[in-house]
Amino acid sequence: MSQKFETSLCEGMHHFLQLLGGNYKGHTSVWFEPGVIGDETLCEETLRSVLGGRFLLHEYVGSLKEKLVEGISIFECSLPDGKLQTAWIDSFHSGSTTMFSENPDINHTYSVLGHYGLEPRCGWKTQIKMDQSKRIIITMFNIAPGGVEEKAVETV
């Protein structure tokens, strides 16, 4: 194990990802238009450290308009590349594709940006935070081609 990785496990982004591990029951809100919640549901999530703490595997199950939604994300901090990276698949948004997202800043909040759709492509930003009461908040934002960012999904 490299010294850089050991340090990250003790006090860096890998440490933060380790803190997120657990089984959770939460609440998900979905916005289909700015400022208007289009659906709310209960969800169940499992976040677990895998491969010696190198990655965080996120599995979730919920519903949208009373239809089952399930998904998987892998969150990582790539020390050699100096990037935060995420691979995300689900039964609602991604169809049969994987959304890859990244951020070249590994020293702050876990926040990554990916893109989807045909030209002009839209952005999809995912942020993971832990509040002072140790609640995990995963928020996803749609970013229109012009750069306007709107909350799309939030799970607490």
Per-range role (PLM):
Residues 25-56:
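Short, solvent-exposed loop/hinge segments that bridge or flank secondary-structure elements
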Residues 141-156:
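Edge beta-strand at a domain terminus
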Residues 8-23:
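N-terminal helix-cap/turn-to-beta initiation motif at the start of protein domains
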Residues 35-36, 64-67, 93, 118-120, ...:
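Short glycine/serine/proline-enriched coil/turn segments at secondary-structure junctions
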Residues 58-63, 86-89, 111-117, 139-142:
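Short beta-strand segments that buttress and anchor functional surface loops
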Residues 51-52, 132-134:
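Residue-level recognition of beta-strand termini and adjacent short loop/turns
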